[in-house]
């Protein structure tokens, strides 16, 4: 099953376990957010929203908040000794799609546990 969602003015086709970068969404890293603007649900019986599907949502886990690549805007007026250079970086949220929910259901999957690196055992015998 797939869904077409809209967030930040853009549309994304998603399936469970997809990882995607979207415009900044409020939420702590590791929490589950619900994206409510579902434009289409696909599968055995596709549903099209007019403009959205009532009661449908997509649950996603926030993996990271970061900044996108630098975009430089440069304008030059020839022979006028005039130029302007500006740059900016977008705020980006990295999401992992956990579930596609229809008919107003609540997400059943909680955030995944964080991986803990195993610490090496102390080498007490080697020091003696």
From Swiss-Prot:
Compositional bias (Low complexity): 119-128
GO terms of molecular function: rRNA binding; structural constituent of ribosome
Gene Ontology terms: biological process: translation
A Gene Ontology term for the protein's cellular component: ribosome
Keywords noted in UniProt: Ribonucleoprotein, Ribosomal protein, RNA-binding, rRNA-binding
Residue ranges of the region described as Disordered: 104-128
Classification via InterPro entries: bL21-like (IPR028909), bL21-like_sf (IPR036164), Ribosomal_bL21 (IPR001787)
A Pfam family reported for this protein in Swiss-Prot or TrEMBL: Ribosomal_L21p
Residue runs in coiled coils: none
Subunit record text: Part of the 50S ribosomal subunit. Contacts protein L20.
Family, similarity comment: Belongs to the bacterial ribosomal protein bL21 family.
Annotated function: This protein binds to 23S rRNA in the presence of protein L20.
Protein name per UniProt: Large ribosomal subunit protein bL21
Highest classification ranks of the organism: Bacteria, Pseudomonadati, Pseudomonadota, Alphaproteobacteria, Hyphomicrobiales
Gene: rplU
